[in-house]
Structure formats: structure tokens, C-alpha cells
């Protein structure tokens, strides 16, 4: 197959499920020369009011199968670094319990994988940043301000992961943090979550990243007594690495993406986006 020009250049993906959004980004890399997209802007809708994240099982299963074969972390494990969905289920809707469970368990998470987790985890940075109001629990601060009064400035609904004091280091490679920042935009139609990455590993981490961000957004929407409307992820450089694009083991995953990522009408999603943009502009 003749390759299209180099994949460096902006790519916008707008889909009603995270599997298809991730699949389209991967197919763009596969079908173009080079292993990177810069920048990648990925937007997902289709979220249900009960917090269920829309996925295409064929793509998710094919990816998890390949990750397992390559001895890499599963989608669920990567997502857990951003939002501990299992603990939220145990907490049964009590966010104070969720934060307490995570704080108590965090030393064990670090001990289970000291090489990758020695610098921290994303949810840990969001809830125990080390300084700031609410003992560094940025999510609790956002929610307490949202609940406490009307007319709160919109710039208040943001949380940082990157910390110059800890993360400006001269290491040749740094696994954490790639996610820099998240922000939340309540609208009349629902909550929009935005996430910003300097770099992102498309094969190894991106799908799990998107799932974790969506779960975080669904949690925040639940606590704001609304629903998750849209997830936007902005990536400076999305890289397809640690696996060659010519690896035969990729073929089942590529086939699943091609079978499920064909263009489909999305009038409803377009209407939602227009309405959300109008609300944000207002």
C-alpha cells in the first residue's frame, strides 16, 4: 500500500466512542509516513448518564490482546493511574471515601511498580499535589467551590499534574508525567473535560489514558449533579512507539480498527457540539 505524506501535522478526531477515536488516530499513523502526529486533537461524545464510557468491544479486545502478548500494561491498568474506577465503585458514590481509600492504598501502588510509579500517579497528583487548598486535593477544591456558590469564575475549574519543582529534571527519559493539566467546563448540556498532554504514547498508553480521563470526567459530572457531555484531549506530540508499524502482530488490531472506524453520520453529535460551544461562548 502506498503511504500518504508524513503524519506530522494537526489531526482532529471527533467520534462518539473512545475506541473509534483512538482507532482513527492509530490508522492515521499507520497510513502515513512517520511515527508521530503533532498535534493531535481528539474529541469524544456519546457518554451515557450512568457514567458508562462508550467503547467498541472489537477494538478494545484486540488492543488488550496485543498488549498482553507484548507484556505491556492493559488498558484498564493504565486508566487506573488517572482514575481509580474500582475504588469509586467500592466507595458507592461517596467521594470522601474514594479519596480516603486511594490515599491509604497509594503506598502499595508505588510498591507494586516502583520503577514506573516512583514519581507518583496522576490521580495522586490530582488529589495530593503537595500544596494548595484542601491539603492539595485539587478535585475536592473544585467541587467544593462549585457546590458552595454560584457564579464561580470558570478558570477555577482546573487541576495541574506537572510540577516544575519535581518534574524539571535532566533525565534522558521520563515516564511521568505526560498528562500536564485537566480542566472542567460545566455547561447547561453537561460537563466538558479537557486534558492536555505534552507527549503521548499512542500504542502503549493512549487508549488507557482516554478511558481514565473519561472516567474522571464522569466522576466529576456525577459530583456536579450533571452528565459528562464531551471529552477533549490535546496532545502536543502523539507517538507510535515500542512497536514497529510493520509488526505482523499488529494486523488483527488494524483490521478491527478498519472494520469499525468507517465514516458514519453523526448529526446528533454535531448538534451537541454546537450547543456546547454556544454555551461555553456565552
Predicted regions and their residues:
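Terminal, non-catalytic protein-protein interaction segments that mediate quaternary/complex assembly
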Residues: 1-282
Amino acid at each position: 500500500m502506498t503511504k500518504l505524506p508524513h503524519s506530522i501535522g494537526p489531526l482532529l478526531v471527533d467520534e462518539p466512542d473512545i475506541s473509534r477515536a483512538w482507532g482513527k488516530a492509530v490508522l492515521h499513523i499507520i497510513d502515513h509516513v512517520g511515527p508521530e502526529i503533532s498535534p493531535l486533537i481528539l474529541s469524544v461524545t456519546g457518554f451515557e448518564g450512568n457514567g458508562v464510557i462508550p467503547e467498541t468491544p472489537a477494538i478494545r479486545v484486540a488492543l488488550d490482546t496485543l498488549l498482553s502478548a507484548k507484556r505491556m500494561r492493559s488498558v484498564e491498568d493504565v486508566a487506573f493511574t488517572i482514575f481509580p474506577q474500582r475504588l469509586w465503585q467500592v466507595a458507592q458514590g461517596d467521594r470522601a471515601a474514594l479519596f480516603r481509600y486511594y490515599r491509604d492504598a497509594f503506598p502499595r501502588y508505588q510498591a507494586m511498580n516502583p520503577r514506573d510509579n516512583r514519581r507518583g500517579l496522576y490521580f495522586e497528583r490530582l488529589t495530593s499535589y503537595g500544596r494548595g487548598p484542601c491539603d492539595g486535593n485539587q478535585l475536592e477544591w473544585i467541587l467544593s467551590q462549585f457546590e458552595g456558590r454560584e457564579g464561580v469564575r470558570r478558570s477555577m475549574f482546573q487541576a495541574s499534574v506537572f510540577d516544575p519543582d519535581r518534574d524539571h529534571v535532566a533525565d534522558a527519559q521520563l515516564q511521568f508525567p505526560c498528562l500536564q493539566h485537566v480542566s472542567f467546563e460545566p455547561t447547561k448540556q453537561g460537563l466538558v473535560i479537557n486534558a492536555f498532554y505534552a507527549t503521548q504514547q499512542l500504542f502503549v498508553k493512549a487508549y488507557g489514558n482516554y478511558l481514565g480521563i473519561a472516567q474522571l470526567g464522569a466522576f466529576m459530572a456525577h459530583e456536579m449533579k450533571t452528565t459528562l457531555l464531551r471529552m477533549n484531549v490535546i496532545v502536543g506530540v502523539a507517538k507510535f512507539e515500542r512497536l514497529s508499524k510493520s509488526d505482523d502482530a499488529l494486523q488483527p488490531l488494524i483490521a478491527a480498527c478498519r472494520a469499525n472506524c468507517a465514516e458514519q453520520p453523526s448529526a446528533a453529535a454535531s448538534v451537541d457540539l454546537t450547543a456546547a460551544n454556544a454555551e461555553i461562548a456565552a
